[in-house]
Amino acid sequence: MTQMTIGHLYTSLHAGCASAVARVLEAHEVEVEFVDLDPEDIEDALEQGEVDLLVSAWFPRDEKFSGPGSRVIGDLYQPQISFAALKALGPVNTLTSADVDRVIVADDSREALEKALKQLPALSALPMEVVGEAALIARLEKAQSEGEAPLVVATQPHAVFHASLLALVEDPGQLLGGEMSARMILREDVARKADTDLLDELSEMMLGNKVMSALDYMIGVEGQDPDEAAEAWQRGRLIPRDA
């Protein structure tokens, strides 16, 4: 197979992941094209053959995208919605308004937070502020400079977890849900034509949350092109914090 189209969400996180996967394809002499997708476009793009490889789907949340004409491969990183704070705190179920004064939640994590707050009555009355994923670092830097004490809810990986702003807050009851698996969805007709060594390499490819947070930071905060960030990863120049 000489050409493959990668579909991915338009965020810096997913663009970085797609570019890293493209590096593996190109090493096997596969020409790569990219298609940016809105979340509501993914299912149609797969069904209509507009993309050959979706990078990436978060399982089990995105199982609906893996129909009978597709093959699910790999385990690139492990997304998880997490509680965090600007300083070390005890487990989330022990916190009160004496410990935190507000909740700042990334937009993609809001639904999970609203469910969790039903089991956290001591925190449910706190003011909630929803911010876009791209605006989270700036908002937390402002909170830090103004002496605020927010409880933060965001999905790892994210650039904010590369910026050394946050300490994770333990969630012993997994109120935000458990760890997911970022996997690739390959059209079955494409998989049958693909080189078996390539499929094996994609299946074994591991980026991990720290690398993905670093990629997200390089692209979303430092403004690097996703291909340049992927090259830095491939050449070992991308160093995750606390690696």
Predicted regions and their residues:
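Short helix-initiation/N-cap motifs at beta->coil->alpha
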Residues: S12, E33-E47, M128-K142
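Short beta-strand->loop
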Residues: S70-Y77, V153, A163-G178
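A conserved helix-loop-strand patch within extracytoplasmic ligand-binding domains
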Residues: R71-E114
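Ligand-binding cleft/hinge of the Venus flytrap
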Residues: A20-H28, S97-D99, V105-V130, A232-R235
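A ligand-binding cleft/hinge motif common to bilobed small-molecule-binding domains
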Residues: V55-G67, K142-V169
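A bilobed periplasmic-binding-protein/Venus flytrap-type ligand-binding module shared by bacterial periplasmic
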Residues: S82-N93, M180-T196
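An extracytoplasmic/periplasmic, membrane-proximal ligand-sensing/linker region
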Residues: T2, A135-S145, V152-A154, H158-F161, ...
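Short, well-ordered beta-strand elements
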Residues: M1-L13, V30-V35, V100-I104, L202
